């Protein structure tokens, strides 16, 4: 292993310290609070609700484009980059009741309409054909062109306002949590006195907002949902449960699980999910301050299928079949679905306990990254590794280096190789931890613990200049030009925090690894 470049480590650490000091210096004033922040449908703008009004910002380049002092605002949603806004107040003024929705034209400075509902509004979603309003137990669907009420849906209690609407008018789907249902428990050994059923809270209803008909129920997780997101084209659904260790991606049309990723080894709160506009990546932010980027490639899809098949075989071989001794007892246990097998991941998520959060970065496995391969997938090292292969290794942010991360990287690389050889001999409880699909890239947000975050992804690849020394790792690579800037083609990963900051990171779409902080801005300017 090459020794760390001290110049690179010093420069990267200094950059990280500058970011942290910027956050400290731009903390909000006593009476300034952010009640709401979100991206618009194509991640080109940010809308923010404050205790004294609301503002709209452009993302590329970042800058304020509209502001209004209008009392305490709890929801501000945009219709792409148009002048149409949906506003809901916090209730501190009579005209800004949390039960009242205002549709505003910012260009004309007029209120198009106001709608009052029987309860507090928890979420508002828009696309070019529909406006959806979510209360705790009711969904209202409107024609956005004339604000005519088209349909209402009674739902189970949804206090967290969990709902997703596709930006696409062609695949105009709505996703929301399904009511609880009883499901078979594949880990319960059936006896005459046992109850082989458990309550399932993690299903998602897919509703066609154009035909106003439900289309399917996707069995996403066994435990309650924490986050859901639909892709820009409405073809993919991403989900995370309240345990927060497994991220899944489904086909909206068929309900088939296409991808499964392991975010980490112990539970955490997932705050947001987002697809890249080209469906190449899905991004997850959590309470660990780390944002994980997962690649939706061919190998990741194959690994998901392979993992499901392996767990199905293991479960079938190790779980006693009660039909052999009691043919009249619970015949459903004769076959365990692959989805139930994969729930072993969630049932055994907290085996490692409260380990250090730095380990959750999972230090990317340094394997060759040809197009279509994942840095987190199992690979083999060749003694004749070429310079081209080295250039394909994941980028490393030297400021995030630690002994824990290096040990983690080595142990995961060895562990996954061992899993390939020994996986068939391990019980599901332990083989589930060796999930082949891990994150392709990650970034660390310079924020306090438990700071809520929302993520977005840029729609194009940018040519960005970054310090060459920032990513150098080879001690022999120090030259007189180490401080020069180098041009990198990067996808922009954007993060908004509840502390009031906007961050822009650069993701190398081919190499993955650690994302580079490119820009940060206070939302209290």
Curated annotation (Swiss-Prot):
It is found in: Preautophagosomal structure membrane; Vacuole membrane; Endosome membrane. It holds the Pfam family PROPPIN. GO terms for biological process: autophagy; protein transport. This is Autophagy-related protein 18. Residues 307-402 are annotated as: Disordered. InterPro entries: PROPPIN, WD40/YVTN_repeat-like_dom_sf, WD40_repeat_dom_sf, WD40_rpt. Transmembrane segments: none annotated. WD repeats lie at residues 220-260, 265-304. A motif (L/FRRG motif) lies at residues 261-265. Keywords: Autophagy, Endosome, Membrane, Protein transport, Repeat, Transport, Vacuole, WD repeat. Residues 374-386 have a biased composition (Low complexity). The PI(3,5)P2 regulatory complex regulates both the synthesis and turnover of phosphatidylinositol 3,5-bisphosphate (PtdIns(3,5)P2). Necessary for proper vacuole morphology. Plays an important role in osmotically-induced vacuole fragmentation. Required for cytoplasm to vacuole transport (Cvt) vesicle formation, pexophagy and starvation-induced autophagy. Involved in correct ATG9 trafficking to the pre-autophagosomal structure. Might also be involved in premeiotic DNA replication. Gene3D superfamilies: YVTN repeat-like/Quinoprotein amine dehydrogenase (2.130.10.10). Component of the PI(3,5)P2 regulatory complex. Belongs to the WD repeat PROPPIN family. Residues 339-361 have a biased composition (Acidic residues). The N-terminus might form a beta-propeller domain involved in specific binding to phosphatidylinositol 3,5-bisphosphate (PIP2), leading to the association of the protein to the membrane. It is a peripheral membrane protein. The keyword Transferase does not apply. Residues 387-400 have a biased composition (Basic and acidic residues). One of its GO terms (cellular component) is phagophore assembly site membrane. It comes from the Eukaryota. SMART domains: WD40.
């Amino acid at each position: 292993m090459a020794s760390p470049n001290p110049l690179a480590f010093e420069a990267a650490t200094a950059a990280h310290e500058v970011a942290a000091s910027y956050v400290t210096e731009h903390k909000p004033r006593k009476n300034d609070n952010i009640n709401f922040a979100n991206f618009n449908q194509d991640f080109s703008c940010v809308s923010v609700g404050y205790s004294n009004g609301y503002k709209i910002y452009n993302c590329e380049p970042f800058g304020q484009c509209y502001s209004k002092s209008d009392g305490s605002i709890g929801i501000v949603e945009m219709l792409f980059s148009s002048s149409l806004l949906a506003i809901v107040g916090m209730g501190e003024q009579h005209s800004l009741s949390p039960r009242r929705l205002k549709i505003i034209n910012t260009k004309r400075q007029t209120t198009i309409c106001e709608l009052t509902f029987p309860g507090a509004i928890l979420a508002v979603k828009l696309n070019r054909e529909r406006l959806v309003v979510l209360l705790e137990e009711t969904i209202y669907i409107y024609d956005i062109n004339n604000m005519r009420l088209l349909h209402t849906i009674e739902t189970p209690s949804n206090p967290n306002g969990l709902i997703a609407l596709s930006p696409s008018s062609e695949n105009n789907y709505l996703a929301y949590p399904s009511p609880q249902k009883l499901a078979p428990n594949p880990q319960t050994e059936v006896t005459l006195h046992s109850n082989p059923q458990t309550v399932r809270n993690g299903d998602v209803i897919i509703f066609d907002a154009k035909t106003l008909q439900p289309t399917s129920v996707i069995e996403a997780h066994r435990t309650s949902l924490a986050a859901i997101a639909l892709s820009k084209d409405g073809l993919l659904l991403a989900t995370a449960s309240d345990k927060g260790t497994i991220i899944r991606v489904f086909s909206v049309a068929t309900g088939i699980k296409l991808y499964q990723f392991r975010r980490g080894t112990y539970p955490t709160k997932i705050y947001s999910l987002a697809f890249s506009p080209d469906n190449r990546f899905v991004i997850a932010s959590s309470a660990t301050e780390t944002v994980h980027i997962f690649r939706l490639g061919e190998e990741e899809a194959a690994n998901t299928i392979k993992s499901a098949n392996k767990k199905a075989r293991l479960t079938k071989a190790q779980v006693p079949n009660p039909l052999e001794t009691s043919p009249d007892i619970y015949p459903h246990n004769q076959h365990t679905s692959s989805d139930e097998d994969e729930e072993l991941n969630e049932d055994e998520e907290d085996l490692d306990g409260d380990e250090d959060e730095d380990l959750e970065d999972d230090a990317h496995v340094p394997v060759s990254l040809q197009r279509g391969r994942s840095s987190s997938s199992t690979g083999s090292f060749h003694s004749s590794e070429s310079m081209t292969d080295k250039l394909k290794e994941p980028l490393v942010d030297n400021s995030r280096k630690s002994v824990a991360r290096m040990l983690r990287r080595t142990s995961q690389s060895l562990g996954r190789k061992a899993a390939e050889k020994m996986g068939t001999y391990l019980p599901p409880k332990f083989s589930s931890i060796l999930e082949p699909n891990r994150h392709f890239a990650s970034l660390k947000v310079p924020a306090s613990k438990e700071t809520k975050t929302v993520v977005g992804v840029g729609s194009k690849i940018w040519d960005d200049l970054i310090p060459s020394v920032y990513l150098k790792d080879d001690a022999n690579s120090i030259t007189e030009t180490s401080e020069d800037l180098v041009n990198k083609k990067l996808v922009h990963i954007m993060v908004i925090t509840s502390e009031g900051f906007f961050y822009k990171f650069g993701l190398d779409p081919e190499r993955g690894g650690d994302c580079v902080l490119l820009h940060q801005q206070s939302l209290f300017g």
